[in-house]
Regions:
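N-terminal positioning helix adjacent to the helix-turn-helix/winged-helix DNA-binding module
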Residues: 2, 33, 45-46, 256
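Charged helix-capping and loop-helix junction motifs
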Residues: 165-170, 198-202, 251-258
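EAL-family c-di-GMP phosphodiesterase catalytic domain
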Residues: 30, 103, 107-108, 156-160, ...
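Basic, Lys/Arg-enriched C-terminal extension of HTH/homeodomain DNA-binding domains
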Residues: 38-67
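Helix-turn-helix DNA-binding segment
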Residues: 1-35
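Bacterial c-di-GMP phosphodiesterase EAL domain
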Residues: 61-179, 262
Length: 323
């Protein structure tokens, strides 16, 4: 109880000196209570980690952060990590969803995920990243009414983590409208081998029971694995950009896309194509039965200040061929 009071005061902006004077306790006692309280709170609710200074967060010698990861954690606190948003539309360019991606303003450059994510090692780094994007999803679901969803990428290392379940539940609790949970979509990479990660499959089912929609990302990528289709059903499947590109000249890639589109029709799920950057790709995919599209033909990822305009722009139906 004492630890909780100290943490609440910290979140409200009170200094240790102010608390010591008000409570009649030594600063040393309050420091001890604060450290213990932060440790317990972050262990149970990792999504709260960005609210605390990095020096207060628990450290695990077995899972220590690299210097690069420490820079990343500091960047979160310094607001140098920011979201960008890319729309997912139907065949009439009507907004169906928005994927939340991230950028890092680092030493005068804006880095894309493929530049820095391969350097992440510690679970804590992945937890902080996921908590950051989940919080962004909740904020935007609350701010923008509608039926379109916001999707969050789930790192492979967290697929079987109980911390992920706790973070998603915390996110669900922050939604102003309970039905808003249907607008939260989690994207799992198809490179996760669900056959050997039974907890991951159980977690997907548990999240779906809670009302969260789950998408299988990167379908038919170069690192694709076979997922247990009879044990695990996703609400949507997203074609990887590489197979969308290959379908322009490879009949086998075309056959794979057609088979997934047909499976989605039969199983009452959606098939999304990403990397749609030309009218030719859009027309081909549409003819194969794909009805959800993402890519530069419609919009590049946009910064937060452009999100309201993006939502308005794709709220009116029109065929991309009519532009």
């Amino acid at each position: 109880h004492a630890e909780l009071k100290v943490i609440l005061a910290l979140l409200q902006g009170q200094t240790i000196g102010e608390q010591a004077q008000r409570l009649g306790l030594s600063q040393k006692t309050l420091y001890t209570q604060r450290l213990a309280g932060v440790k317990k709170l972050v262990e149970c609710h990792p999504h709260l980690a960005p609210r605390f200074p990095r020096t207060l967060l628990p450290r695990s010698p077995a899972n220590a952060l690299t210097a690069f990861e420490q820079e990343w954690v500091q960047a979160i606190h310094d607001r140098q990590v920011f979201p960008v948003f890319q729309p997912i539309v139907d065949s009439r360019s009507q907004l169906q969803g928005v994927e939340i991606l991230i950028r890092w303003r680092h030493r005068g450059q804006v880095l894309h995920p493929q530049t820095f994510l391969p350097h992440f090692r510690a679970d804590y780094t992945w937890l902080l990243l996921t908590a950051f994007v989940l919080q962004e999803a909740v904020q935007n679901i609350n701010e923008y009414p509608g039926t379109f969803y916001f999707s969050v990428n789930i790192p492979s290392s967290l697929a079987d983590s109980d911390s992920l379940l706790r973070m998603v539940e915390a996110a669900r609790q922050q939604l102003r409208q309970p039905e808003g949970v249907a607008r939260l979509v989690l994207e799992y990479a198809e490179t996760i081998d669900f056959r050997h990660q039974s907890r991951s499959a159980a977690h997907v089912a548990q999240l779906q029971r809670a009302g969260v929609r789950v998408m299988l990302d990167d379908c038919f990528s170069q690192g694709s694995v076979i997922f247990p289709a009879r044990r695990l059903h996703f609400n949507a499947y997203k074609l990887d950009m590489s197979i969308v590109n290959d379908a322009q000249h490879d009949p086998k890639a075309l056959a794979l896309i057609k088979s997934l589109a047909y499976y989605c029709q039969l199983s009452d799920s959606r098939c999304v194509a990403e990397g749609v950057d030309s009218l030719a790709k859009f027309t081909q995919l549409k003819s194969l039965g794909i009805d959800r599209f993402q890519g530069y033909l419609f919009s590049p990822p946009m910064r937060r200040e452009h999100l309201p305009d993006l939502i308005r722009r794709f709220s009116h139906q029109r065929d991309p061929a009519d532009r």
